[in-house]
Amino acid sequence: MGRSVYVASPEGLTGKSAVALGLLDALTREVGSVGVYRPLTTAGPGSDDIDLIVDLLVNQPGISQSYDEAIGVTYEAARQDADEALHVIVERFGQLTDRFEVILVVGSDYTDVATGTELSFNAKIAANLGSPVVLVVHGRERNPEQIRAAADSAIAELRVNHAQTVAVIANRVDHDSAEAIRAALADLPGDVVTAAIPENPLLSAPTFRALVEAADGELVLGSQTWMDREAMGVIVAAMSLPHVLDRLVPDVAVIAASDRTDLLPGLMLAHQSGTFPALAGILLTGGYDMPETIRRLSEGVQQHLPIALTDLGTFTTAERVVRVRGPITKDSSRKIETAHREFAERVDQAALLRAIDVSGSEVR
């Protein structure tokens, strides 16, 4: 089979999509043609759902491949008959090998049904595809010893299933611990390429639109385009304006009761002033219509800042929006650029590409 590399993780929320995006960028700079393959997905060909990672990767510059061509089988198919699913996965992968010099394979997400066998199944897939594995381990709120233990355990599981690990990337690590984590991974056996990438809040930040949708709200003033800007935090404006202004940070979403119309002019002026941080948007709760006088003032003062309204109460709204995660999508230009930069700065790409080129699986 042609050259390939398998990006896998032993758990969810590792930020694997950002690593895959950075690796894809490195590969497309190095070789003439790169394909994308997702062996397991919740959104197979013909589904109404979309696998966001596949949609992201096949829409990157230099990728000439349709969404359906990048899909293997669904989780449901794998649950019903794992052996048949593996056969189909290998068969569909084989249809790509003659078209591309290298194929980037992205493992499962652990967001469907995370079980103790999921990494094992990913390992079997990697082994049968002949793909060396780039292992992405979760570094958030973990110390160097915990990350090393997670890497050792996952590498052992991969080895038992005949998959070879050529790189370990600890992702979303604490900035202050990055050097210690790199040192903890440096002596992994087998000449494994290692790296530690610090957490970047932008990469998991939801858009203001996603927050509004989570609260069943709708835009009442401002720009639809600005609804797609990332919200880097949320504050509840349950205090007077001077105290709210003290708590503003760049690109924050402000939740305020819709009958607190005294706050709106001050927040809009702060957003426009240049002396306070720009906001992601304002989400008004309680369902009260904006008074006509405030609406006229708003239309005169600001042009872009989105202001949305929900019928939900402030507590329920806040409870919903703080749970919203923001995946990297094909339209997330800031996130894509950031993922490329973080990967390029933190990973020895030349060493990683050499490891991918010379490595393979024990199973053919």
Q: In which residue ranges do the predicted regions lie?
A:
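Glycine-rich beta-alpha junction loops
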Residues: L40-T41, R172-D174, P198-L203, G286
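Non-catalytic interface/targeting segments
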Residues: N200-D259, P327-V363
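Conserved catalytic-core segment of NTP-binding enzymes
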Residues: S108-D191, A253, S258-V324, I328
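P-loop NTP-binding module
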Residues: S4-E11, A26, N59-P61, A85-G107, ...
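Short, basic phosphate-binding NTP loop
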Residues: M1-Y6, V19-G22, I307-V322, A344, ...
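Ligand-binding beta-strand-loop-alpha-helix segment within the catalytic cores
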Residues: S66, G72, A77, A186-S204, ...
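N-terminal phosphate/diphosphate-binding loop that engages ATP/GTP or pyrophosphate donors
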Residues: G2-R99, D112-T115
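Acidic/glycine-enriched edge-of-secondary-structure segments
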Residues: S4-G12, V73-A82, G107-G116, S131-E145, ...
